[in-house]
Amino acid sequence: MANKAVNDFILAMNYDKKKLLTHQGESIENRFIKEGNQLPDEFVVIERKKRSLSTNTSDISVTATNDSRLYPGALLVVDETLLENNPTLLAVDRAPMTYSIDLPGLASSDSFLQVEDPSNSSVRGAVNDLLAKWHQDYGQVNNVPARMQYEKITAHSMEQLKVKFGSDFEKTGNSLDIDFNSVHSGEKQIQIVNFKQIYYTVSVDAVKNPGDVFQDTVTVEDLKQRGISAERPLVYISSVAYGRQVYLKLETTSKSDEVEAAFEALIKGVKVAPQTEWKQILDNTEVKAVILGGDPSSGARVVTGKVDMVEDLIQEGSRFTADHPGLPISYTTSFLRDNVVATFQNSTDYVETKVTAYRNGDLLLDHSGAYVAQYYITWDELSYDHQGKEVLTPKAWDRNGQDLTAHFTTSIPLKGNVRNLSVKIRECTGLAWEWWRTVYEKTDLPLVRKRTISIWGTTLYPQVEDKVEND
């Protein structure tokens, strides 16, 4: 066995993997109230609630700022820096490691390689040599489509996004310029989507004994001097996925509850019919993207535009070619002591802002009947007190109970906060035993953009129509 002393030192470590790999983000109290704002064309209700998000993942994203330390076989220290995806690399003399790559067509003898002293440069050089051989000998007959993965979330806070996409997402988030103030005020809805297009994965053979990864020159004292202990054990990067990833910000000022469904249709490439609510939402959506990998440049690329560029962005990196070599986009780690895959557990509280808009409407009355008519129209107007509780204020039309003759027409504007709308219309029959006859009576009418109630006919045969236009 290579380096028995170091092997025994690592095997003797006793630690709680879950505790080491758990990160708790923000903790907040649920002290939020509803509020309502009457705008010129609509009544907007803003409701904020405490939400919690937890994730368990072994797949860690790679960013442009940390990829030089993240190569297959790298030894990383399990501490706060690893939880923040800004890991500490253990640089010591290393024993050879065997690597494999999952590109199609490779003969068994060509699908793996050995690196004598694994480091970022030596591993990258060996992988690049193998890729060059694949392109030359196999690439012409093996067309490799990217393996597509995506995940999405409606944005409410940076802590929430860091739990969802990785603890170092803030770097990418800053490039996306996420306007959380507008989200919290209810002015915008924002969704973040992460597309991963994986071209190939490089893996290392599982470590049989912890000491096998070190040269004999490495001592237990060397590890202790670098802070390695049961409180700060080691993991090794067991695989790295190479390809391209795109972070999309979809931002709209629409207050519709169909925004998430419209964005889902966009992401999945569903054809959206014209003159639909989804089309209106997407036409009112701005897109910003941060693109990592997929071209020879190692830098991140930021582009902005409308939703019609989303499909092009995805298709742009859909296949692995020599012109689209890919970069490290994610990695997994295993504990050096026992090869158990390291699973990171992150959680946070955040404030979810839900905005509901109620459009103003009009109630049109049209009376052309050969009789005297009376209207009784009442409603409540909704508001919220300082504790966020609903307050309903009774209102009534100022011409209720008046005798009105044909031809009478009027429009009653109703604000978006109208609730419990009731309309009663009666006509004078002239009959002693039924002087007033009810022509129309409905309660709790929904507020619509335009409702026209028309009455006509004679005293004994009154007619009525209730026409709703809600485009």
Swiss-Prot record:
Changing residue 88 to E: 4% hemolytic activity. Changing residue 264 to D: 76% hemolytic activity. Keywords: Cytolysis, Hemolysis, Host cell membrane, Host membrane, Lipid-binding, Membrane, Secreted, Toxin, Transmembrane, Transmembrane beta strand, Virulence. GO terms for molecular function: cholesterol binding; toxin activity. It is a multi-pass membrane protein. Erythrocytes hemolysis is inhibited by cholesterol. One of its GO terms (cellular component) is membrane. Changing residue 339 to R: Loss of hemolytic activity. One of its GO terms (biological process) is killing of cells of another organism. The chain crosses the membrane at residues 158-171, 178-187, 256-265, 273-285. A motif (Cholesterol binding) lies at residues 459-460. Pfam families: Thiol_cytolys_C, Thiol_cytolysin. Coiled coil: none annotated. Elongated monomers align along their lengths, indicating intersubunit contacts and suggesting the prepore structure. Modeling based on cryo-EM shows a homooligomeric pore complex containing 38-44 subunits; when inserted in the host membrane. The size of isolated pores is detergent-dependent; in amphipol A8-35 homogenous rings form with 42 subunits. A cholesterol-dependent toxin that causes cytolysis by forming pores in cholesterol-containing host membranes. After binding to target membranes, the protein undergoes a major conformation change, leading to its insertion in the host membrane and formation of an oligomeric pore complex. Cholesterol is required for binding to host membranes, membrane insertion and pore formation; cholesterol binding is mediated by a Thr-Leu pair in the C-terminus. Can be reversibly inactivated by oxidation. Belongs to the cholesterol-dependent cytolysin family. A highly conserved undecapeptide in the C-terminus has residues important for membrane binding and cell lysis. Mature protein has 3 discontinuous domains; D1, D2, D3 followed by C-terminal D4. The domains rearrange substantially upon membrane insertion, in particular alpha-helices in D3 refold to form the transmembrane beta-strands. The relative position of domain D4 changes, allowing it to interact with host membranes. This is Pneumolysin. It comes from Streptococcus pneumoniae serotype 2 (strain D39 / NCTC 7466).
